[in-house]
């Protein structure tokens, strides 16, 4: 399933030296600043390192975030704000807005932005792993878990940290509610795709598969609706992907619902359900073409070329043919003019984000270390403050070549 998932670019950031020569009055503060600089550099490097795995990413992220906590919370009292929170300006681009960054002189902004990139890394890791030629069951579980972890990070940022920013996120930027909600919902939907593929492979009841597909389609529809008020120039490509996935999984729901109806001797209704699946599958095919032609951030996924996509077309056709034959020989039922209403509720397999918390403050942050930062010696002329409108060099992400499609789904 290489290139089955749409991915927006990673956020890019300006370098941060953590050099406060005049303010630092002792070795503990110097060590913290040196460690912060190297931990940040290391974490940024790992975002584009194809050999990086979740354990390596978690360790590197925890190290940086534990050090950064001393710039956010007071040592020994996490309810109090650190005196260092506003001494450093941070610049980050947004996933849909090109190379012109947002800038805030606030360590909370850095925590959120870097955390956002960690979540994006988990989604990209899941996409790469799902694209392996012969994915194992353990790898499929890791895809599933990585997407749930990403959803949990996005959710935690939205609920616990973005509200703490003094400067609210601008419209269309990553940290505003519409975008972060869309990322959360997309992660949940993609994790449920893994569940559906598994349920199909294990030949679970058609009713369960139909319900899971319907719930997944509803997730994609909700994510698309969340982005509907954004500028089309920024969101059109992403929304095409969400729309095509919504059509694809609604077609899946109608296909498997048709099988359930046939098993209940409701052949006429089954035929109508399969006809609806056929129509929606054709719509998904057309949307794949439109998606490929739509300009926007991120590389173009190629869902219509996958066996997982094409298998549905064959399944719909064969099941519809079977229903029509059975109706001609056995049932002789009238085919309804209206497609059946899908009021399906899955009782199993629904995805919830994995709860996330940032690590506690590093043990390097002692009262002595904090005291070694003397804000009275801070330069009065803050001429080093970067201008928000200056462009930040984009992250050069590795190009993932599609592997041979063997038809193995993430299962």
From Swiss-Prot:
Primary localisation category: nucleus
Domain BRO1, residue spans: 90-408
Superkingdom assignment: Eukaryota
Positions bearing Cysteine methyl ester: 408
Region (Disordered): 376-411
PTMs per UniProt: Farnesylation is required for nuclear envelope localization.
GO CC, alphabetical: nuclear envelope; nuclear membrane
Matching Gene3D superfamilies: alix/aip1 like domains (1.25.40.280)
Propeptide part(s) removed at maturation, as residue ranges: 409-411
Entry-linked Pfam families: BRO1
Quaternary structure note: Monomer. Interacts with CHMP4B. Interacts with CHMP5: this interaction allows the recruitment of BROX to cellular membranes. Interacts with SYN2; this interaction promotes SYN2 ubiquitination and facilitates the relaxation of mechanical stress imposed by compressive actin fibers at the rupture site.
Purpose: Nuclear envelope-associated factor that is involved in the nuclear envelope ruptures during interphase (NERDI) repair, where it is locally recruited by CHMP5 and reduces cytoskeletal stress through its action on SYN2 to help reseal the ruptured membrane.
Family from the record: Belongs to the BROX family.
Protein name: BRO1 domain-containing protein BROX
Gene that produces this protein: Brox
């Amino acid at each position: 399933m290489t290139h089955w998932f749409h991915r927006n670019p990673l956020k890019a950031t300006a370098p941060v030296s953590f050099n406060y020569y005049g303010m630092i009055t002792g070795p503990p503060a110097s060590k913290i600043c040196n460690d912060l600089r190297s931990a940040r550099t290391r974490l940024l490097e790992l975002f584009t390192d194809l050999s990086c795995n979740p354990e390596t990413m978690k360790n590197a992220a925890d190290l940086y975030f534990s050090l950064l906590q001393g710039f956010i919370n007071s040592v020994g009292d996490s309810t109090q704000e650190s005196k260092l929170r506003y001494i450093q300006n941070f610049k980050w681009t947004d996933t849909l807005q090109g190379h012109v960054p947002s800038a805030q002189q606030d360590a909370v902004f850095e925590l959120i932005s870097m955390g956002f990139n960690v979540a994006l890394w988990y989604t990209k890791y899941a996409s790469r792993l799902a694209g392996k030629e012969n994915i194992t069951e353990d790898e499929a579980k890791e895809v599933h878990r990585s997407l749930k972890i990403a959803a949990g990070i996005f959710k935690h940022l939205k609920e616990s940290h973005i509200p703490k920013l003094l400067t609210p996120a601008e419209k269309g930027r990553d940290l505003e509610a519409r975008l972060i909600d869309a990322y959360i919902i997309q992660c949940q939907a993609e994790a449920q795709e893994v569940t559906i593929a598994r349920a199909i492979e294990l030949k679970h009841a058609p009713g369960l598969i139909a319900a899971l597909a319907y719930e997944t389609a509803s997730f994609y529809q909700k994510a698309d609706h969340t982005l509907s008020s954004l500028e089309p120039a920024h969101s059109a490509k992403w929304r095409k992907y969400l729309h095509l996935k919504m059509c694809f999984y609604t077609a899946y729901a109608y296909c498997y619902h048709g099988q359930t109806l046939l098993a209940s001797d409701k052949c006429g209704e089954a035929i109508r359900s399969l006809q609806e699946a056929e129509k929606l599958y054709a719509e998904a095919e057309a949307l794949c073409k439109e998606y490929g032609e739509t300009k926007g951030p991120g590389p173009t996924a190629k869902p219509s070329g996958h066996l997982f996509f094409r298998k549905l077309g064959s399944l719909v056709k064969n099941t519809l043919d079977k229903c029509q034959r059975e109706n001609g020989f056995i049932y002789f039922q009238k085919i309804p003019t209206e497609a059946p209403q899908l009021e399906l509720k899955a009782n199993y397999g629904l995805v919830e984000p994995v709860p996330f918390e940032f690590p506690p403050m590093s043990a390097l942050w002692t009262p002595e270390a904090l005291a070694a930062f003397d804000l009275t010696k801070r330069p009065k002329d803050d001429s080093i403050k970067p201008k928000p409108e200056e462009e930040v060099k984009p992250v050069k992400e590795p190009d993932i070549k599609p592997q041979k499609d063997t038809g193995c789904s993430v299962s």
